[in-house]
């Protein structure tokens, strides 16, 4: 059904002010004399630029963009300057059955807007159709949405960066620290109340000092692009806290700007760089906040729905929903691909960001018939002279058919490895049949990533992430406790592979608490001593809790915020984690550039990794297949070849021993060439670091149940 477009004109129309302008660059660009406006739409018939007062409340004039070049509507407004508040109204067919949902009664956000002002206010006027109408989304709503929509603001991009430069931490030295702008700063005692929850809060010295002293390399921020709070959450007094509901890919969310100025983000980046920390942004290019056919018309839906979104081929009224949120952006369309890559380049060049983590990244590599590692977007990122220099991290799955693509992204990408999470959790919980998989996870899951010249760092290892239990809760709860989300505890995963160790939630039992803390040390030691790229979630390093909530997406509250009031046990864990990170960075063998494969290298007479049974002998096939096996030694030979050059390495030789049994296992320490004895550097049974003890070859070490040890080979003359 095709509907006519009607809209009430504003009080003033001054078409004579506009000039032709240029179709490039897209967005609103100030050149010092005026502002050029350019908007892509392949199917619109007319575009109006709407100018608002400084408060963004009164529409002052409406000006038709006069030119249309290569599917770009454009015009130039002389004497316009930064600070100008604007939006668009776009005309065309309202024909949902054929994918078109133009409605000029709806003020639209420029997809290239660099700053938004105001917050979205939910109203029925936001929808292109009339809610409650018998025809549903086929109906046409004539109410003006301008009073309820955030407005776009023209910016002056000039900024004095001083000596700031990209930190460029090598992948083998990268340790990711996943956090949230509000979550990290809302309860920090050193952050002034007026900047808590903002980029300015992240600049506070004590916040940066904690991250720097921890030893991580890269701060990965949950989404900071402007986003929309879901209406149903606001009705319950909640918000879309995590921010995975973007509406403007070039604009930081206004709520994170204490000063209201874009420069605040740049200053934050400069402060982190000064602390030698990279800035990684979690980005959500797989969908927008406009939802499915019943969602609001806020931006791309009203600009060119049929171009921006993937629609059902047999009925374009409906959206393909590989994101699980109602819609899916179509990166097979060249202009959508351009928008996403332009956005990435903007954040990398103009905002000095060091890398990106892509939410539901499989979508970004989808054509109509599924995922293709040669997708134009993935190829463009590899070839682009800017993007090929920054870190690209994929969450390699989505909700669509064939969405699980771990290990299948092309060279140049690293990937979240959820198999590491699941295997490590199951192993330390004591599940049967985990030993062989555990060994694979400790060697960067080579069966998935050791191909096409990819390196071990391609596997991003994690035990916890923002979605799911915190590390403390992983060892304290068997079941999720999401009652605070007001969804009858139906939200969040039920497959947590968690274990409460005897009591659900907090307990005063000293034995249970001791075991829980040992398990946290086990998880951290496994993560930080494994090959691959480790990722830590902020607060886990001192046992932060969400009280059993494993889906705090809507908890902009003390549930979702980091509590900086450390307990004695939390402070002890923090010291332990710092020591593990220092060990990882000190010993290159823990972060090799080549996969450990367990083959004997005849050229240099060395086997890079040897897997040992408790009696000190090599593991047999039968032992690998024993579903009850829970104890293993991992001997990493420092003489193993480190590069493509066939020569011996010069690194330390280390022995990692794990015991996931309930009881003590006596482990025979092996004799190794060019060594004299072993020293113990880590024992997770010990909450504090102790002096290095000497252990002779073939001596037995009593490995406590549920513990991990790390030994270093020493020569007699090194005493």
Predicted regions and their residues:
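Beta-sheet entry/capping signal
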Residues: 36-38, 174-175, 217-220, 276-278, ...
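Substrate-binding/active-site clefts of carbohydrate-active enzymes
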Residues: 145, 180-353, 360-386, 403, ...
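Core domains of carbohydrate- and sulfate-ester-processing enzymes
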Residues: 90-160, 231-239, 245, 275, ...
